[in-house]
Amino acid sequence: MKVNVSCSSVQTTIDILEENQGEDESILTLGQLRDRIATDNDVDVETMKLLHRGKFLQGADDVSLSTLNFKENDKIIVMGGKNALVDDAGFKMLMQYEKHNLSNLQKAYDLNLRDVADLERGFLEKPKQVEMGKKLEKKVKYFNEEAERHLETLDGMNIITETTPENQAKRNREKRKTLVNGIQTLLNQNDALLRRLQEYQSVLNGDIPE
């Protein structure tokens, strides 16, 4: 049976009273329902209230959901403050890495982009353009190597321990994913910049007509 959960502006669906699911996934009691909603919505399980058909769901954690008159697609409204997650050691590690390393990576790409654009303007004599193009090609290729090293470093970071709460662990994983996606975006942009530079070098070398 599916029930719809509304927490602030977020809508989710939960399967309840499905005994054929794995033991860890089955939601048969009020306590299991509370825990699932708290995990999905980052809500404090101790202070949240669940409103169902105009009444608050009350009772011990072992109360069976089958006694609470749920019907298919019933709506549960979650009332309660969000958990105030702290920046634990893993999250702080990611924040520090972003501040001291990844911001510089963005600056390096922006500089390469500007230098390639300056080269394409053709203000320098041709021999100097050729020389500058070779130097830029090395810089642009080095950027990829540096970005790959950052990806390896992020992948190897121990941002979750045995004592990390699940909601904090989820937050840490999402933060790392955001950083990884940002680096991969820069890598894609840098690959396009390298192709652009190499095409201009081909023009300078006479391989492609101007």
UniProtKB/Swiss-Prot annotation:
GO molecular function, one term: adenyl-nucleotide exchange factor activity
Name of the molecule in the record: BAG family molecular chaperone regulator 1
Superkingdom in the source lineage: Eukaryota
Keywords on record: Chaperone
SUPFAM superfamilies cross-referenced by the UniProt entry: BAG domain, Ubiquitin-like
One of the protein's GO biological processes: chaperone cofactor-dependent protein refolding
InterPro entries from the UniProt entry: BAG-1, BAG_dom_sf, BAG_domain, Ubiquitin-like_dom, Ubiquitin-like_domsf
Chaperone in keyword set: yes
GO cellular component, one term: cytosol
Cited Pfam families: BAG, ubiquitin
Domain BAG positions: 108-194
Primary gene name: bag-1
Role description: May inhibit the chaperone activity of HSP70/HSC70 by promoting substrate release in an ATP-dependent manner.
UniProt KW Transmembrane keyword: no
SMART domains the UniProt entry points to: BAG
Assembly mode: Homodimer or homotetramer.
Domain notes: The BAG domain probably mediates direct interaction with HSP70.
Organism whose genome encodes this protein: Caenorhabditis elegans
Ubiquitin-like domain ranges (all copies): 8-85
